[in-house]
UniProtKB/Swiss-Prot annotation:
Alphabetical list of InterPro entries matching this protein: Amino_oxidase (IPR002937), FAD/NAD-bd_sf (IPR036188), Zeta_caro_desat (IPR014103), Zeta_carotene_desat/Oxidored (IPR050464)
Leading EC class: oxidoreductase
Protein name in the entry: Zeta-carotene desaturase, chloroplastic/chromoplastic
Gene name of the record: ZDS
Pathway per the UniProt entry: Carotenoid biosynthesis; lycopene biosynthesis
Catalytic activity: 9,9'-di-cis-zeta-carotene + 2 a quinone = 7,7',9,9'-tetra-cis-lycopene + 2 a quinol
Pfam families: Amino_oxidase (PF01593)
Length: 588
């Protein structure tokens, strides 16, 4: 693997320069391809830290209490048998918490691989195919806690503390959070000094943010979060424009961010979703700091979690899908799950447990909920949530696409070079992308080959019906428009992954329909990033939902034991009736 992957390559070789005036009105020089020269002294970046012992936000203080719950008390109730449907991050998070409390856990997954939306697999040619592009904010304390617990704390690479925008023609804009003083001054400096917006737009942007609940978050994080929740009914665009923000700011900066967060633009995303992130960026210095996995999620995220679960006695059952949730109704009208009808190819079986957790995505839980349950408002609300289609494209090149400073260097294959970070763009159908050969080199850098761009097409709707060849053609054309210096480089391999419904559409007014992890059915629980938790639909939200689901199950330990005995007694009674009837028939 490329040993230089832990450095930001700043070649000192000659480059073509041209002077120009930037959108903010200032003048400066551009390297070939449009990259702006910083007026700071450029020095080689120190080795990137790959652990979670520093540069992580402390979400236990001066933060909304619900975002990072305290460690659970030691469970002293009865040992429970728990069946979890879904081996995504939410399901595995639930499993880890339950196993740590001494319960027995089985996880059922209909696919041949685990990880859900953060899953990956290896194709016949040895290429790692991901379900999407995964970036870890510095405020992902629940996910970082999980990674530490399972021994994966050294599997993340810290990126430069900037948010980079690639504009048409190779022009680079930045939100540069590198500043001697931390929050909130580092953020104020980043927004006031950004070259992604014109001076007027920056000023109006500052006014809008100054009038937001983000300011209150500095002194009253819980109060600010409630204010932000109250803004769920309006779109971010409507809120932002009402506070003096400009349409240009939305188009050039906030739309790419919104697409990256929720796969929809500012006109369609809830103000709650965007302001939740802004509040964290404003109050926590490292919240905006990005990390990416060393390599593929299956190896560096799902893999360690799976090993931990198995070592703790948990069991995975792959390719077992749930066909039906079986349930009974008590004489008092209450319902409980009596089993899960599972199938694997031609095999079928009924799975029984004390508690059942549906850790599914939105379309998955919709298929799973029995028709009768949908009459309840709790479950009926789920059908008011819909998922967003997304298409993830991987393009392997025979050179380094994002190398803007040195044309000759971009054509060589001996050393990885280019932009090592998450990249946003307002000028392509993919809102965010990264060169995984640089950003996650362990599995994606291949000696003798070049960039592996992973591009997330949002909205994915126009691309869903297109053949893969047409998608590749369109995306590679847009890559060339962003990086003219890549003219002449060839795509040597590609892949396309289409997901019909990924994250739930966090549009205005949808937050009240997110279900709690505890349901009206006594022994049936939910987990998933779409369920009710204080963060947005994300990896962090999925992990947090698993912690909350586990807490509900442990709190209900005694009741679930009583239900187990009740079900056993009812089954024994049915068997007794069957034996009595058999005896009567024998006498006849």
């Amino acid at each position: 693997m490329a040993t230089c992957s832990a450095y930001l390559c700043c070649p000192a070789t000659s480059a073509s320069l041209k002077k120009r005036v930037f959108p903010d009105g200032s003048a400066g020089f551009l390297f070939f391809g449009g990259r702006r020269l910083s007026n700071r002294l450029v020095t080689p970046k120190s080795v990137i830290r790959a652990d979670l012992n520093s540069m992580v936000s402390d979400m236990s203080t001066n933060a909304p209490k619900g975002l990072f719950p305290p460690e659970p008390e030691h469970y002293r109730g009865p040992k429970l048998k728990v069946a979890i449907i879904g081996a995504g991050l939410a399901g595995m998070s639930t499993a880890v918490e339950l196993l740590d409390q001494g319960h027995e856990v089985d996880i059922y997954e209909s696919r041949t691989f685990i990880g859900g939306k953060v899953g990956s697999f290896v194709d016949k040619r040895g290429n790692h195919i991901e379900m999407g592009l995964h970036v870890f904010f510095g405020c992902y304390n629940n996910l970082f806690r999980l990674m530490k617990k399972v021994g994966a704390e050294k599997n993340l690479l810290v990126k430069e503390h900037t948010h980079t925008f690639v504009n048409k023609g190779g022009e680079i804009g930045e939100l540069d959070f590198r500043f001697p003083v931390g929050a909130p001054l580092h953020g104020i400096n980043a927004f006031l000094s950004t070259n992604q917006l014109k001076t007027y737009d920056k000023a109006r942007n500052a006014v809008a943010l100054a009038l937001s609940p983000v300011v209150r978050a500095l002194v009253d994080p819980d109060g600010a979060l409630q204010q932000i929740r109250d803004l769920d009914s309006v779109s971010f665009s409507d809120w932002f424009m009402s506070k003096g923000g400009t349409r240009a700011s939305i188009q050039r900066m906030w739309d790419p961010v919104a697409y990256a967060l929720g796969f929809i633009d500012c006109d369609n995303i809830s103000a709650r979703c965007m302001l939740t992130i802004f509040a964290l960026f404003a109050t926590k210095t490292e919240a905006s700091l990005l990390r990416m996995l060393k390599g593929s999620p299956d190896v560096y995220l799902s893999g360690p979690i799976k090993k931990y679960i198995i070592d703790k006695g948990g069991r995975f059952h792959l390719r077992w899908g749930c066909r039906e949730v079986l349930y009974e109704t008590s004489s008092d009208g209450s319902m409980y799950v009596s089993g899960l009808a599972m199938s694997k190819a031609t095999q079928k079986k009924i799975v029984k447990a004390d508690a059942y957790v549906a850790a599914c995505v939105v379309p998955g839980i919709k298929r799973l909920v029995p028709q009768k349950w949908r009459e309840l408002e709790f479950f009926g609300n789920i059908y008011k949530l819909i998922g967003v289609p997304v298409v993830t494209v991987q393009l392997r090149y025979n050179g380094w696409v994002t190398e803007l400073q040195d044309l000759e260097r971009s054509r060589q294959s001996k050393r990885a070079t280019g932009l090592d970070n998450l990249l946003y763009t307002p000028d392509a159908d993919f809102s965010c992308f990264a060169d995984l050969a640089l950003a996650s080199p362990e599995d994606y850098y291949i000696e003798g080959q070049g960039s592996l761009l992973q591009c997330v097409l949002t909205p994915g709707d126009p691309y869903m019906p297109l053949p893969n060849e047409e998608i590749i053609r369109r995306v590679s054309k847009q890559v060339l428009a962003l990086f003219p210096s890549s003219q002449g480089l060839e795509v040597t391999w590609s892949s396309v992954v289409k997901i019909g419904q990924s994250l739930y559409r966090e549009g205005p007014g949808k937050d009240p329909f997110r279900p709690d992890q505890k349901t009206p059915v006594e022994n049936f629980f939910l987990a998933g990033s779409y369920t009710k938790q204080d963060y947005i639909d994300s990896m962090e939200g999925a992990t947090l939902s698993g912690r909350q689901a586990s807490a509900y199950i442990c709190d209900a330990g005694e009741q679930l034991l009583a239900l187990r005995k009740k079900i056993a007694a009812a089954e024994l009674n049915e068997i007794s009736k069957g034996v009595s009837l058999s005896d009567e028939l024998s006498l006849v």
